[in-house]
């Protein structure tokens, strides 16, 4: 039997509503709650090298910028990804 995986894209797809400006505290809270909920794959935003880094937004130029936001947070067994 195939295993079903749950992917959450709130921090990426939700950005179409607020121009990816969730605020740093909200980004961390959403991330931590989704990890606690046990999602298998968590999309943390868009990578767009035309954008400058802003820790309040989930659209960022590089994976190093994503690591500045999420790198020290507990990821459990969740795979962390971003859309290009």
Identify what each model region corresponds to:
Residues 2-9, 17, 44:
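Amphipathic, alpha-helical segments enriched in basic
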């Amino acid at each position: 039997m195939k295993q079903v995986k749950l992917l959450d894209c709130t921090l990426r797809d939700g950005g179409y509503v607020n121009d990816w400006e969730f605020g740093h505290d909200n980004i961390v809270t959403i991330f931590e709650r989704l990890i606690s909920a046990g999602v298998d794959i968590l999309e943390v935003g868009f990578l767009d090298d035309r954008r400058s880094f802003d820790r309040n937004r989930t659209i960022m130029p590089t994976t190093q910028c994503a690591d500045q936001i999420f790198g020290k947070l507990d990821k459990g067994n969740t795979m962390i990804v971003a859309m290009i």
